[in-house]
Amino acid sequence: MFLNSPDPVCRSTSADHLYRRSAVQAGNGTALRRRRLFAALVSVTLLGGCAEDALTSRFQLKPDDIIIERRPDTAYEKLFPYYVELCAASRFRSKLTGEGGGPAGHAILYIKGACKDDEAQFPQLRRCRGVATSLEDPEHGTGVSVNQLFKNVNWVATPGYELVFPGNLAPGERLTLARFQAVEQQAIAKGIYRGVTFHRFAGATSDTELRDFLERAGIGTDLALQFARSVFCARLPVAEAMLEPIIAFLNDKNREYAEGEADYNWSAWADNCSHTMRNALAAANIWSPLSVRTTKIRQIFNLAVPANEFVNLAELMTGGDIEDYRDILRNGPRRDAFHEFDWLPTRQGALLKTLPVHDPNDLYDTTFWLFTLQSPFLMGKTQRAIELLSDERFVDLDTNLHYFERRYAAILAQHDERRDSMASVRGTRFRRVEGLYYDYIHIQRAEVQSMLNRIVAMPTTSEE
């Protein structure tokens, strides 16, 4: 169902409850609104097709400023049974045709624990059978991708990490036309686009012509992303129960188009890939949703840009306030996630991943280009992305676990000191919530310590 209510309240039948933007999120003040509006107006100029000049280059994430390739090691899959990865992919350009994507790039959501439903007549998800401990497991997970050429669905599901990201191409192996055609055939055989019709595009012979679509806009966008793009992912472990509302939201989204009368019409402003990915995560209370297809003025405040959403999630899962339970109560999505799933988004295992475009590459330009939406004077999003991708706490699993172990220990130590000094006080109006919160912190600390012990006991292996 669309999250398209013009009110601060958006209903999703898939999540089966109302999402309310908190007062802080809904009204951050006139100054913030003006800054966001200014940034939006700047984006109009850039997205409108201007050349890659000095101004435009200021909005790019540059490979010289960041770690080119970082990925969680093999231990990660054994420690975390379920996670979501929100990925921003850079702009692509074909060497053969000269065609390329828009400056904002692309967004994709990878879900460990959700698998493609091969029995469905159009793209749908189901729970994976069992818990995967290896990326090679066929029941590991699925990549969900929105494409502007889709007509009767909003997204498709590509099964398996290897097909979603490297396209089954080994590091250092040359991407040739033959390897491209092999992946094309694999996509057809796996039924990734079963039941999907497309908006007509130049050169297409029909609205179901799959090979034309794959060659023009499928491979490098919906699957085999590294054939054509560099990819940045924010990986966030989730509770098992959180998979259900995410899957339900996405299935409902496709069902509305596949079984309803309306066609899906992609919009950079009002209904793009990032809107779907963000709102799928909002269905599980990871953060607040964004409205789609509201009035034009309202939509300015609901823009979604792949790189921005990557940074937003990265900031939430690495730097959110978990020290004060009262702050958690003031934030609607965090409060709901805590009470419903016994889960907070700032947590151990929250890591950033960077994957470069394949090189050597006969088919696509390997020049890096990824746009962020921001003020040209402050450049906050670009700088924040560079900082996070350069911080060992958020790219290295062992460092990450030790960081959160210290953080949890400090919270508990401070609580012990406060409890001793307030021993004569019988409690506060938040007494029950406080108890739940500190029980949660104890459990998280014990989980981190268990993970560190398990890593020590694991045989040494190379990175995946």
Please tell me what each predicted stretch does.
Residues 142-225:
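Low-complexity, serine/threonine/proline-enriched polar segments
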Residues 30-41:
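N-terminal secretory signal peptides and thylakoid transit peptides that target proteins
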Residues 55-180:
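Intrinsically disordered, low-complexity N-terminal segments that are enriched in acidic
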Residues 51-71, 195-464:
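Activation targets extended, charge/polar-rich intrinsically disordered C-terminal tails
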Residues 4-7, 16-19:
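Intrinsic-disorder-associated, low-complexity terminal segments enriched in Asp/Asn/His/Tyr and depleted
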Residues 2, 24, 30-31:
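Secretory targeting signals
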